[in-house]
């Protein structure tokens, strides 16, 4: 059964920062916050808040999945090793990080095509249609059944999402 057929994220896979394939079905039964990230963005300090959510709720079946992306202002120019080092040393990130992906356009990772179709945002002139991700640190909350529950824009701080996570745990 395809991910689209059962309307969950579990049919997708992505490569971890070390290049190893990761099936999202490995996260089945967990509440997830899937985020497109960047190391040189004004929202980059949100890594700290994302890690705080992971620390707070991780033992209750929650995880953050970070997907670096260089599509917005070329704010993630580094390779996987640089990204890993930056996130771990600067923000103490221990949640799973994946290889750099595109989140919009014809080369968008299939997971992000699915996420944006399942939870469209607002259409904004010059920034794309309703399904397009507008900037770094857009967040998608996914329930324990692998269904997209809510989409949050870049300005939504991780601690503002805590109550929604709590409801799903």
From Swiss-Prot:
It catalyses: a hydroperoxy polyunsaturated fatty acid + NADPH + H(+) = a hydroxy polyunsaturated fatty acid + NADP(+) + H2O. Hydroperoxy fatty acid reductase essential for the removal of lipid hydroperoxides under normal and stress conditions, leading to the protection of membrane integrity. Optimum temperature is 37 degrees Celsius. Its EC number is 1.11.1.22. It comes from the Bacteria. Belongs to the glutathione peroxidase family. PROSITE patterns: GLUTATHIONE_PEROXID_1, GLUTATHIONE_PEROXID_2, GLUTATHIONE_PEROXID_3. Transmembrane segments: none annotated. The active site is at 41. This is Hydroperoxy fatty acid reductase gpx1. GO terms for molecular function: peroxidase activity. Induction: High light, methylviologen, t-butyl hydroperoxide, and salt stress conditions increase the expression level. Mercaptosuccinate, pCMB, and nethylmaleimide act as inhibitors of the catalytic activity. GO terms for biological process: cellular response to oxidative stress. It holds the Pfam family GSHPx. PANTHER family: GLUTATHIONE PEROXIDASE.
